[in-house]
Every structure is written in structure tokens, then in C-alpha cells.
A protein has these predicted regions:
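C-terminal PAP-associated
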Residues: 1-244
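Extracellular/luminal regions of secreted and cell-surface proteins that mediate adhesion/ECM remodeling
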Residues: 244-343
Length: 343
């Protein structure tokens, strides 16, 4: 088993921000023969994890409410392990101060470590710092990976001094990312599980939250967290990232053109994501400039389940009129697509 801890260079005796790992081999028959390896340090992108010198009173609540615990210097519940066919993955997070000044704003530093096989060294595959919309506090997080490699993350959110809306009380929220998204970023928009309706009455808050997967489909994320909602309660919410459909394609971005000097033969490139369970190939995609004739072409290669691919249309667009603002729309035209709302 692997034991991990985060260490901040603001702490005495710590020179650089890092994650420290120990391998523990327990001999259940002869406990005295158990072994703990020397520590392995993985240097991280610098972070600030100290709030108020390490005290338990950190994040002021709206309307002069008591400042509650940011749960600093702790890897939050829990580091999650998952085996895939060609690598192992571990996810974890802890709170950081993303403001960089005397004004505090809690954010979530999260990591995915990978090893190529059991017993091989762990390496940082991706690390990101999540900040909530409107510069709200985000902390007390828990994250896990579903059967498709998508990440779901639940967390606590509340107004900070940097927020335009100062009245958001402690609530429970979620975000996430698809497995094929650009690394280091939680790409999904924030979702609301429950908004708080009152301040937490003391400094102690949460201790930890907990996310887990529904064993029924290995896709639904269940997240439980502490909020004030008609009293102090632990409330569970459920959300899902992976599709339940066999056939489901989506155009997730129009990559070019974007802006600048455009030409009479402008290339149009889009990114397609296969959200379904089945691999797909030989489907049509289209683009349209304003109300002009729709361009339809065939994507002949295969996009495996959960993967993304770029396609550049062979038919170019005339976008050369100076001062003109062009509107470009694009769609996937898969026969039998079971969710046409995201095409």
C-alpha cells in the first residue's frame, strides 16, 4: 500500500512544495517483519496551503458570520486508487490559498498520479488548481474516477471577499472532467447539489466530505457533504458525467477559424467527442456560415468510446469581407445518435 502526504515549503524544515510517498508492506502473520520504504518526494507546482498561521478559524461567512475551518494541511478524504489495463491511477486533493495576498480565497489543488504497473514508481500525470465561479471559496473536496476515466469532484463553496455576490453561504457543489479533456483542468461547469440557507454556527466545519461511485453502473458519482439547509445536515447528491447511450456524438468545439485576418479559403476545424459506449466511424459532420448553404462531409476514421478527434473540412469558407462578423455552427450527423441535444 502507498501512504501519501503533502508538504508546504512554508513549513519549518521543508525546502520545496512537494508530495511525499511511502510504500508500506504489512506482514499480517509476523507484524514485526512489516516494512516501510524510504520516502519518495514528487515536486509539485508551487502552492500556498497555510491559512492564518495554521489556525482553525479561516473563512469568514456572510454577514459577519464566524470564520470556519479551511481544513488546511490535509489530504482530503480520500486518496482514490483505480486500476486500468495499462496503468494505475491515484487521485487526491487539498485546499490552497489562490489569492496570493492578505485577502484569502480557498481553492482546490488536485492531482492524478500514475504508475505503469503495480510496484512501479508513481509520477504526477496531472495537477490542477480549481477555483469556483465568481471567485468563491472552494474547499473540502473529494474526487474519484469512473469506469471511463472521467473524474467527478464534489466540494464546498461559499462567497469570499473577492466575490461579487457576498451572500452565498456554505453549499455543496460539483464539477469534473472527461478522460480525454486537456489535462490539469476541471472542464465541466459547476453544478449545484444544495445551496446553504444559513451560516455554520461554529468554527468547526466538515472535517471531510466523501464521494464514491454507484456500483450499479460505475458511472454515477454520489457525494455527501455538510451544509445548513433547514438546520445542520449531511446531504447526499448524485451526478453523472459518462453517457448511458451506445451512440452519442458531440461537436465540443470549433477550433478554427477564431479571429484575426481571415481569407477567401479559410479552413474550418472542429473537435468531435464520442460520448457513447460504442466506437463510431463513417458518419457525417457539417458546418454552416450564417444562413449560407450547409457544408456536409464524411468523417471516415474511427473514434473509440470516450475519445476525441479533430476534423478539418476539405471545403473551405470565404470569410474575407473586412469588418464582417461571421457566425459558424457545426453538427455531428450520426445516424441513430441517441442524444441529438448535444450534436
Amino acid at each position: 500500500a502507498t501512504v501519501m502526504y503533502m508538504q508546504d515549503d512554508a513549513w519549518s524544515g521543508v525546502d520545496t512544495d512537494h508530495v511525499k510517498l511511502w510504500n508500506v508492506a504489512i506482514d499480517w502473520d509476523t507484524p514485526n517483519d512489516s516494512e516501510v520504504s524510504a520516502a519518495v518526494e514528487l515536486t509539485t507546482t508551487p502552492f500556498v496551503s497555510v491559512f492564518d498561521g495554521g489556525s482553525f478559524s479561516n473563512l469568514p461567512q456572510p454577514d459577519g458570520g464566524i470564520a470556519i475551518d479551511a481544513l488546511q494541511a490535509t489530504i482530503m478524504n480520500q486518496a482514490q486508487f483505480r486500476k486500468f489495463s495499462n496503468y494505475n491511477s491515484a487521485l487526491f486533493n487539498f485546499v490552497v490559498d489562490v489569492d496570493g495576498s492578505s485577502t484569502k480565497q480557498a481553492g482546490i489543488r488536485w492531482y492524478e498520479l500514475r504508475q505503469t504497473a503495480d510496484g512501479e514508481p508513481w509520477e504526477i500525470f496531472q495537477e490542477g488548481t480549481y477555483t469556483a465561479p465568481d471567485n468563491r471559496h472552494a474547499w473540502n473536496a473529494s474526487l474519484i474516477m469512473d469506469v471511463r476515466g472521467n473524474i467527478g469532484m464534489g466540494y464546498s463553496g461559499m462567497s469570499s471577499d473577492n466575490s461579487s455576490d457576498s451572500q452565498v453561504r456554505v453549499g455543496s457543489y460539483y464539477t469534473g472532467r472527461f478522460a480525454q479533456d486537456p489535462i490539469n483542468v476541471m472542464t465541466l461547469e459547476e453544478g449545484i447539489i444544495v445551496e446553504g440557507d444559513a451560516n455554520i454556527p461554529g468554527t468547526r466545519y466538515g472535517d471531510y466530505s466523501k464521494i464514491d461511485l454507484d456500483p450499479d453502473n460505475d458511472k454515477k458519482f454520489w457525494f455527501i457533504n455538510e451544509v445548513m439547509s433547514g438546520g445542520r445536515k449531511n446531504i447526499a447528491g448524485v451526478f453523472q458525467i459518462a453517457s448511458n447511450f451506445n451512440n452519442d456524438l458531440a461537436i465540443i468545439s470549433i477550433d478554427t477559424p477564431f479571429s484575426g485576418v481571415l481569407s477567401t479559403n479559410q479552413s474550418v476545424t472542429v473537435t468531435i467527442q464520442n460520448l457513447g459506449e460504442a466506437d463510431v466511424s463513417g458518419f457525417d459532420v457539417s458546418y454552416q456560415i450564417g444562413n449560407n448553404v450547409e457544408v456536409i462531409e464524411t468523417y471516415s476514421e474511427t473514434i473509440t468510446s470516450g475519445s476525441i478527434a479533430q476534423y478539418t473540412f476539405t471545403t473551405t469558407a470565404d470569410l474575407s469581407t473586412e469588418g464582417e462578423t461571421y457566425t459558424i455552427t457545426s453538427s455531428s450527423l450520426l445516424n441513430g445518435d441517441e442524444d441529438p441535444t448535444n450534436d
